[in-house]
Amino acid sequence: TVLNQEYEIATVPTANTYTFVAKNTSGVTVTANASDSGNGGSGVDGSYQINIGLDVYLTSAGWGSGTWGSGTFGSTSALSANGQLRLWTHDNFGENLIINPRGGGIYRWVENNGTSTRAVELASTSGANLVPTVGLQVLASEVDRHLIVLGADPIEGSTRSEVLDPMLVAFSDQENELEFEPLITNSAGSVRLSSGSQIVGGVKSRQEIIIFTDTSVYSMQFVGPPFTFALNLINEASGLIGPKAAVVDESGVYFMSYGAFYVYNGSVQKLPCSVKNYVFSDINDGQAYKIHAFTNLEHNEVGWFYPSSSSTEIDRYVIYNTQEKIWYYGNLSRTAWLDSGVVSYPQAASSNYIFQHEIGFDDDG
């Protein structure tokens, strides 16, 4: 019972050893005694939590970085998921939850197993066949019931390469999130996008999924056999500034690009913006992956929380009223946002607090 608990590693004296402080089931520290000798068993199995990642974005150096032939251009530039800003995506597949830390593994939490159980790696689940081992984002195509992985690792022979392809879109067989092998008897497959250097993010809209690269916008629509999905390039001049910088409301998909705001509602259109210079002349591009879009549908608003140039954390917002076609901005730190619907009022998070918005008359509702 002493060892069969969750522990935090205290020290790592060598590459192959670590220490922790033993405790009883009440949390009280315990020490070894004579009766412990010979009672430890011949081996100990440990299950480890995944690395928490970083709280800042690190700009990679290497291929495509800087000017042609200078500095580290042409060298390996990949950063591991553990050594990069930790961003999560998740989506429901039926009653189960599929989750993915950007650039890391893909996990599934099974609702029937109860809240006391943890999510497990999808590729190691019994019955899994050629499930991607890494990805940039996961989405479930709700109407046709396919699991989609943006930025998956490709299939090489009879296995996955375990090396992320930032432009590869992989999708499972219909109604089966464990089957990713493309066969004539199923609808699994993959498509590699061509415009851009990496997929930045994707959102689900009406009857389609909008996928953004760093330079372009694609529409992904279910078309059935033999192709399953059609991926159409719809714009090449408006990449997404960060994975969370797009949001869907009743009038379209709104997103922040580099130096401008756009809306997609059948075609991509640049939004006239009276505060454009204020926002983009004082924004921390190096932490753009922290930018996140939000909706406040009751007030016909879409907006973005972003870090100013002097901050590595979110400290500002800009809002667009989709009915009145006006912009407004301010200073506020919010790192997550849930619009009303499931809850009565919008909920937002920052600095260990959850705030309820659009209620009361002060800034601490």
Identify the meaning behind each predicted range.
Residues 60-62, 66-94, 129-145, 192-205, ...:
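Structural signature of eukaryotic scaffold interfaces centered on beta-propeller domains
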Residues 95-118:
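Hydrophobic or amphipathic alpha-helical targeting/insertion segments
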Residues 162-175, 316-322:
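Beta-propeller blade signature
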Residues 194-365:
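Beta-sheet-dominated scaffold domains
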